[in-house]
């Protein structure tokens, strides 16, 4: 494999036995693709905004005289870019302008004659835009719209599994779910009658729906039943025989024909009997009269002479009926064929309980159910029923719904529309009856073929359509009012409802979430999250076990591991690594096609619906060099996801990769295959909580997924085009683009500005650090600068720490950890947290608040860190209570007593009419001010500090643009110089001229002269473009800010807090092995090995066996080997051994094992080998892919190569006594994370503070400055000790005895330390509550 310049800096050795067939796809596709479909920059096809507009327009007035037509739409450019929107606290959005056409028809002339057309662009609000990283900036904060997993539209057949009725009878039901519109349910009741419900309302007999569709009783029976025919001949009753129908019944009489008895009375009719009847071609048999009694007629029988109905359809036949039929001249009677086995009489029974008799009565019944209390009219009843299922405005199955519907009812694809037809409804009822009759299966609702993904674009489109429908109502009313002379489309449209709907969705929908920005992984997983909650989804309380469970169809689509613990378990899932959604919104996963036992390179994506029909082999099946299966029988997933053994020629597909089944976070856990699933779940979830450390450190033991995640997360800076590094410093990188990647006429320069020390949503620090040097070549898509938690373009969430598994004086009891002081000294887990504090100056009734350094009654020392505008300096170190922004608020005039007036008159005006309302640092916080931003309302004069900030921003912007111009000019003048030299101008002449003068030279060659003139024009263009860009920047910087009503000024102060690791902080490995630091131990007391190297963290070995996460042990061993090889390389470099030896050793390390990866160092130059070796000194980075990782033999081989014992255990000595520990101890390197659960954020103390209103007990929680709850069990503990007075104090004066605590306070002030407990307030509350129950309670004096 060929490596690029930057890849050669550090190569991760992979243990993967199988070569990668398919690269990891771009991880944010689900978000970006969905939103692109929504806004379609070049609308084609009916989706997104285009579909929404087309579904609502044209809007026609009620009289048809005018209509408002939609022509096209365009999205403008956003005013501010993403970064500016975040700073200003605005939404990153683009204006939507729609071209509408108002057409007026001439009423007098022929139909369709146009009288007037007005076309106009109408503003329809702002549409939030997605950033390149799949997020939205709403009011300055980054948000993510999580995709939703909801039940697909279509028809579903289900049963209650015998839970509804006491008898345990299974009741079947069918439900037609449209994308939008009314739900239609059919269900059996315990008596086997079929009922229908519309929108889950009161149930009606299902035949009412059929009658409302216009069917008569006879037609209904005809559709659902086969008939049996009886003939009356010479007083004999003959039945037309269909032998197959008799199977399984017991003969009630002798079945005979032509004198031969085929079945004796009382015998069960079997297939043998039927064959005999068919062989002899028996078509009729004689039956006793009783056999027809109780049967049901299939049609109306009318007395032809009188026109009177002798026997209506669906009536039971009795002896009288037979006589009446014979009298009316009928000798052939058709009855319904039913039996108790597999042809139930359900529809016939339902018709008997149906109170309606024709279409109108059925429509009225439906109207009464839907609109109780309203008087039904024929028109209203018809309109209601039609609008419910047969109107495209109110009902839409959608393409997905129609596809699922047709699949379920075996209708050919492409048949049918978005609304229901009569055949659709009848088809559903027929299939439901078939299932009740024992033919056919119910659907599995949790199958991923029945649940689909709704992503951002689709949800935004639905919200937009809701807004449009509101507008449509208003427009239609306005059009119907008439008098449209001089009215333009702009006058008709009010964009507020649209803006409101869109704003509500992006701002406060349950699926629009504050982005989890702890680290790059948490960003990526948040964008790939799939939630079953949200509008139109499930609710936590109602979701049962089945919905939450892992389903066979999750394989390769949703991760079976990564899901939250707690009430949302199983409802919130994560997309698997290779999963994607298809056009219908169903999840697909890729497979390699297998033809005749030969695995091909062809890759096909299958959805859960399609996958069920195939036999699929696992990714780790053994193949030979020709990609044929080597085993006689291969373990595969067969039909319905069941596992089994199959021969190679029976296999259709093979998995693409071993990590196909898990999500991105789970794919980061090395040796995942050796961890218990519950712990792996914790490991995957805790990686998302890791705080970026000061210096990122790549994991020695990784899985190979680190690079794709870091690149796709968008936190690092990636080269858009290849080139060489022309300039690099901490805040910007300039790349000179390769000639072949530039566009003609451009200078070929890319400038990347880096993000420095900004705050993330979780208050962690976002900072980018260049990882390239001047003059280095870079390729397109390669890393230029590392972001938070990335190291040379690889995800680095924690630190490689030397750990030992052993008890140490009880300091690692119950998952605690003992940490060496060295870890603190080296700042291994030091993190920076940035807090934003803001001060708002408002316009109050009594006058404007003012930001100033002149604050009443505050000493000089308190103002020492403020400038003349009253705002803190950048770089000031502040602690709790310090003033950051001085602010005074006017207070109401107070009446002064004469003495005060006199003092005022003598000593001058003391600022009495204002009170201090400055912004102070919250208690318990200290840090350094790293940035201040001042926002001033338009029309309010800016203070000096605001002007200074503006100056700096202008200078920065100008510097950026000037630099860009200089680089562009340099490129241009190089071409001019070459042209002039070719044209015969002497080198010396050029050296003596200023560069601008070169363009004024004249050349003899006309073609060259033309080229020179073109270059001169280009130079002029560059200058103009520079001026234009500078002007735009300048206007943006100096314009006033759009602040909330009544706000004059906002000052935001950013504090950076440096947090070292300390006891009480939570740490974890990647295998769910979490714990809290119990003690920071001096280095000299830590256990050390024979070389005197102390361990850094001591972990408890008892945390491993019961938790069954053995992966951490294997990681520790492999980490030790990786570090051992690094140490050997380090030794060789220090001894300055020749490069050949170094190259040989490193090659040996890369060649070890049976991995598919091959690294050939012979293609590397000496300089490249040296650079690689320098980067490997801290350890050889290894990748052990999920389910395809390193074997025990490979780990031992690496340990040997590193000169370490193959057991992975070494002798340790006690740091305090120097004595040897009696057993060997497992020591190695584990990748540890510091989680965002820091003791600083949790620790809190209170002496006195606020109390709850009713109970008068102290509030709870740090945010409320609450107290510690002394609960039931703590009371028992004090009771057990017999500590009566302590208990009394706890329950009275320290809690809710109001008088007692005020007295106590007074006593302490007076210096007399005794308490007088009284009655606790909560006792009074319970007394009042008992009195509220009308029980009087009086207190006696004790």
UniProtKB/Swiss-Prot annotation:
GO biological process, one term: DNA-templated transcription
Any Pfam family hit: RNA_pol_Rpb2_45
GO molecular function, one term: ribonucleoside binding
UniProt-listed SUPFAM superfamilies: beta and beta-prime subunits of DNA dependent RNA-polymerase
Keyword Nucleotidyltransferase: yes
Catalytic activity: RNA(n) + a ribonucleoside 5'-triphosphate = RNA(n+1) + diphosphate
Enzyme Commission number(s): 2.7.7.6
Keywords assigned: DNA-directed RNA polymerase, Nucleotidyltransferase, Transcription, Transferase
KW Transmembrane (keyword) present: no
InterPro entries xref list: DNA-dir_RNA_pol_bsu_ext_1_sf, DNA-dir_RNA_pol_bsu_external_1, DNA-dir_RNA_pol_su2, DNA-dir_RNAP_su2_dom, DNA-dir_RNAP_su2_hyb_sf, RNA_pol_bsu_bac, RNA_pol_bsu_CS, RNA_pol_bsu_protrusion
TM ranges: none
Gene3D superfamilies in UniProt: 2.40.50.100, 2.40.50.150, 3.90.1100.10, DNA-directed RNA polymerase, beta subunit, external 1 domain, DNA-directed RNA polymerase, subunit 2, domain 6, RNA polymerase alpha subunit dimerisation domain, RNA polymerase Rpb2, domain 2
Biological role: DNA-dependent RNA polymerase catalyzes the transcription of DNA into RNA using the four ribonucleoside triphosphates as substrates.
HAMAP family xref list: RNApol_bact_RpoB
Protein name per UniProt: DNA-directed RNA polymerase subunit beta
Source organism of the structure: Glaesserella parasuis serovar 5 (strain SH0165)
Name of encoding gene: rpoB
């Amino acid at each position: 494999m060929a490596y690029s310049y930057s890849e050669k800096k550090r190569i991760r050795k992979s243990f993967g036995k199988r070569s990668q067939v398919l690269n990891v796809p771009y991880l944010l596709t689900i978000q970006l693709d969905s939103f692109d479909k929504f806004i379609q920059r070049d609308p084609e096809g009916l989706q997104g905004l285009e579909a929404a507009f087309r579904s609502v327009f044209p809007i026609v007035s009620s009289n048809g005289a005018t209509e408002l037509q939609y022509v096209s739409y365009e999205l403008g450019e956003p005013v501010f870019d993403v970064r500016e929107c975040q700073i200003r606290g605005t939404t990153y959005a683009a204006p939507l302008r729609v071209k509408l056409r108002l057409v007026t028809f001439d009423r007098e002339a022929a139909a369709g004659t146009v009288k007037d057309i007005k076309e106009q662009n109408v503003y329809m609000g702002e549409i939030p835009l997605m950033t390149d990283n799949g997020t939205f900036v709403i009011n300055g904060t980054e948000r993510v719209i999580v995709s939703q997993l909801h039940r697909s539209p279509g028809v579903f057949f289900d049963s209650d599994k015998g839970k509804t009725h006491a008898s345990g009878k299974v009741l079947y039901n069918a439900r037609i779910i449209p994308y939008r519109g009314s739900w239609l349910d059919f269900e059996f009741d315990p008596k086997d009658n079929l009922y229908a419900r519309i929108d889950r309302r009161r149930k009606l007999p299902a035949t009412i729906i059929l009658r409302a569709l216009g069917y008569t009783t006879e037609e209904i029976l005809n559709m659902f039943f086969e008939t049996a025919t009886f003939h009356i001949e010479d007083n004999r009753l003959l039945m037309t025989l269909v032998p197959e129908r008799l199977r399984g019944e017991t003969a009630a009489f002798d079945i005979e024909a032509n004198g031969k008895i085929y079945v004796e009375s009382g015998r069960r009719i079997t297939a043998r009997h039927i064959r005999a009847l068919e062989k002899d071609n028996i078509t009729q048999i004689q039956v006793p009269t009783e056999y027809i009694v109780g049967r049901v007629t299939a049609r109306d029988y009318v007395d032809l002479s009188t026109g009177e109905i002798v026997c209506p359809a669906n009536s039971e036949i009795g002896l009288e009926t037979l006589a009446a039929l014979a009298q009316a001249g009928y000798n052939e009677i058709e009855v319904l064929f039913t039996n108790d086995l597999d042809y139930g009489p359900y529809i016939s029974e339902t018709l008997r309980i149906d109170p309606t008799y024709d279409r109108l009565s059925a429509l009225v019944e439906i109207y009464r159910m839907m609109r109780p209390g309203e008087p039904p009219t024929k028109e209203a009843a018809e309109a209601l029923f039609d609008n419910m299922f047969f109107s495209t405005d109110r009902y839409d199955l959608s393409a997905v719904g129609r596809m699922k519907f047709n699949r379920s009812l075996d209708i050919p694809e492409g048949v049918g529309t978005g609304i229901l037809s009569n055949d659709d409804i009848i088809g559903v009822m027929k299939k439901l009856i078939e299932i009740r009759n024992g033919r056919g299966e119910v659907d599995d609702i949790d199958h991923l073929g029945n649940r689909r993904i709704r992503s951002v674009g689709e949800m935004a489109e639905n919200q937009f359509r809701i807004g449009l429908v509101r507008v449509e109502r208003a427009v239609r009313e306005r059009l119907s009012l008439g008098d449209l002379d001089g009215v333009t489309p702009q006058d008709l449209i009010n964009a507020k409802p649209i803006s409101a709907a869109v704003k509500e969705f992006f701002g406060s929908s349950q699926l629009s979430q504050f982005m989890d920005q702890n680290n790059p992984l948490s960003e990526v997983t948040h964008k790939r999250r799939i939630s079953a909650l949200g509008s139109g989804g499930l609710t936590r309380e109602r979701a049962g076990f089945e919905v939450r469970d892992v389903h066979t169809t999750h394989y390769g689509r949703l991760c079976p591991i990564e899901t939250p613990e707690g009430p949302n378990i199983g409802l919130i899932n994560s997309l698997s690594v290779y999963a994607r959604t298809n056009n219908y919104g169903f999840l697909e996963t890729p497979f390699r096609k297998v033809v005749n036992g030969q695995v091909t390179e062809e890759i096909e994506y299958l959805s859960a619906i399609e996958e069920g029909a195939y036999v699929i082999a696992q990714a780790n099946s053994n193949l030979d060099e020709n990609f044929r299966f080597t085993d006689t029988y291969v373990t595969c997933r067969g039909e319905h996801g069941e596992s089994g053994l199959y021969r190679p020629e029976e296999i259709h597909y093979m998995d693409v990769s071993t990590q196909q089944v898990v999500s991105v976070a789970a794919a980061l856990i090395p040796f995942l295959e050796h961890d218990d699933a519950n712990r792996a779940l914790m490991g995957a979830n805790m990686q998302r909580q890791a705080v970026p450390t000061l210096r990122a450190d790549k994991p020695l033991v990784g899985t190979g997924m680190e690079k794709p995640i870091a690149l796709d997360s968008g936190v690092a800076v990636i080269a858009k085009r290849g080139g060489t590094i022309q300039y690099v410093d901490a805040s910007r990188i300039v790349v000179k683009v390769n000639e072949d990647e530039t566009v003609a006429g451009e200078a070929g320069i890319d400038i990347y500005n880096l993000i420095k020390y900004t705050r993330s949503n979780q208050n962690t620090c976002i900072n980018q650090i260049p990882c390239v040097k001047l003059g280095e070549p870079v390729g397109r898509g390669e890393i230029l600068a590392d972001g938070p938690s990335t190291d040379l373009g690889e995800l680095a969430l924690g630190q490689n720490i030397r750990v030992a598994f052993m008890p140490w004086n009880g300091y690692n009891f119950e998952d605690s950890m003992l940490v060496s002081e060295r870890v603190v000294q080296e700042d291994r887990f030091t993190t920076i947290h940035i807090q934003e504090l803001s001060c708002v100056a408002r316009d109050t009734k009594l006058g404007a608040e003012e930001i100033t350094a002149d604050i009443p009654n505050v000493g000089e020392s308190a103002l020492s860190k403020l400038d003349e505008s009253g705002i803190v300096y950048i770089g000031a170190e502040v602690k709790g209570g310090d003033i950051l922004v001085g602010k005074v608020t006017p207070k109401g005039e107070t009446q002064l007593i004469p003495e005060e007036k006199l003092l005022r008159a003598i000593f001058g005006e003391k600022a009495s009419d204002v009170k201090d309302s400055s912004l102070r640092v919250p208690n318990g916080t200290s840090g350094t001010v790293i940035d201040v931003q001042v926002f001033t309302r338009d029309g309010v004069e800016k203070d000096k500090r605001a002007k200074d900030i503006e100056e700096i921003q202008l200078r920065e912007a100008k510097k950026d643009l000037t630099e860009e111009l200089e680089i562009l000019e340099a490129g241009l003048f190089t071409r001019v110089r070459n042209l002039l030299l070719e044209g015969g101008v002497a080198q010396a002449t050029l050296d003596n001229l200023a560069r601008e003068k070169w363009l004024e030279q004249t050349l003899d060659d006309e073609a060259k002269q033309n080229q020179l003139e073109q270059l001169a024009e280009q130079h002029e263009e560059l200058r103009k473009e520079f001026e234009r860009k500078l002007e735009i920047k300048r206007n943006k910087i100096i314009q006033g800010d759009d602040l909330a009503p009544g706000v004059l000024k906002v000052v935001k102060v950013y504090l950076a807090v440096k947090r070292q690791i300390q006891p009480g902080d939570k740490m974890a490995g990647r295998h769910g092995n979490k714990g809290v630091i119990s003690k920071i131990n001096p280095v000299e007391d830590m256990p050390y090995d024979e070389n005197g190297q102390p361990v850094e963290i001591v972990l408890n070995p008892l945390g491993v066996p019961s938790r069954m996460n053995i992966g951490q042990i294997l990681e520790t061993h492999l980490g030790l080997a990786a570090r051992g090889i690094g140490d050997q390389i380090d030794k060789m470099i220090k001894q300055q051994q020749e490069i050949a030896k170094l190259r040989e050793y490193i090659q040996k390390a890369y060649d070890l094992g049976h991995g598919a990866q091959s690294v050939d160092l012979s293609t590397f130059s000496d300089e490249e080998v040296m650079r690689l070796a320098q980067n490997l000194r801290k350890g050889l980075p290894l990748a052990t892919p999920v389910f395809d990782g390193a074997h025990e033999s490979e780990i031992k081989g690496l340990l040997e190569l590193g000169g370490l014992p193959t057991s992975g255990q070494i002798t340790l000595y006690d740091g305090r006594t120097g004595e040897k520990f009696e057993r060997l101890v497992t020591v190695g390197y584990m990748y540890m994370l510091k989680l965002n659960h820091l003791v600083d954020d949790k620790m809190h103390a209170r002496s006195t503070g606020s109390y709850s209103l009713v109970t008068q007990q102290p509030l709870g929680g740090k945010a409320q400055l609450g107290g510690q709850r002394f609960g039931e069990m703590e009371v028992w503990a004090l009771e057990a000790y017999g500590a009566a007075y302590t208990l009394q104090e706890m329950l009275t004066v320290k809690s809710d005895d109001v008088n007692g605590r005020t007295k106590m306070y007074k006593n302490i002030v007076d210096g007399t330390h005794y308490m007088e407990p009284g009655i606790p307030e909560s006792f009074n509350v319970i007394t009042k509550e008992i009195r509220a129950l009308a029980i009087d309670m009086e207190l006696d004096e004790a």
